[in-house]
């Protein structure tokens, strides 16, 4: 469902700016509330490896976990809640929260996997650009702050602007499993 915010003249009975038009279209995605509200989080949270999806994913079949590629220190996995089609995460196998806690091998392979992810996404999806980044800590926007992960978000001309990343809302044209298969096939051995 989409719609623009509309100003409603209530004769001065409103308190504040509620209802003022901002000119932006809205795409309502109620399914995102599962992620936002934490309904699918394990009871103990993500702080311990036993409940961390990034610790569990490498032990599952690739088709189930959406893992695209595995290295010695890190792996690439599709984001279950993508900001844009093809949104990949590069994660160390080790359950570590802070970038400064990575060792040299993890840091180097994370960089190489990020570069490879960009090449694969360009080849498969013809991305025009990328947003790369890590949210370090819950206050910085990390949904799973206990396990470091690098975002590789493909961008296309006309895909709006950075708002789909911040607004966490985007229509996806392809099933995640289909995207995973295409990326895994294109990932160099």
What are the functions of these language-model segments?
Residues 1-189:
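HIT superfamily nucleotide-processing domains
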């Amino acid at each position: 469902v989409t719609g623009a915010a509309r100003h409603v003249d209530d004769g001065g009975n409103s308190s504040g700016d509620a209802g003022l038009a901002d000119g932006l279209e809205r795409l309502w995605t109620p399914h995102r509330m599962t992620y936002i509200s934490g309904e699918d989080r394990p009871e103990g949270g993500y702080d311990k490896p036993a409940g961390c999806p990034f610790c569990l994913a490498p032990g599952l079949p690739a088709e189930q976990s959406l893992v695209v590629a595995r290295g010695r220190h890190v792996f690439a996995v599709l984001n279950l809640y993508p900001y844009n089609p093809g949104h990949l995460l590069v994660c160390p196998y080790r359950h570590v929260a802070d970038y400064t806690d990575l060792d040299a091998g993890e840091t180097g392979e994370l960089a190489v996997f990020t570069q490879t992810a960009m090449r694969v996404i360009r080849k498969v999806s013809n991305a025009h650009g990328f947003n790369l980044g890590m949210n370090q800590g819950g206050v910085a926007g990390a949904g799973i702050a206990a396990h470091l992960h690098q975002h590789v978000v493909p961008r296309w001309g006309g895909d709006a602007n950075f708002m789909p990343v911040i607004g966490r809302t985007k229509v996806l044209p392809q099933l995640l499993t289909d995207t995973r298969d295409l990326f895994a096939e294109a990932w160099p051995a």
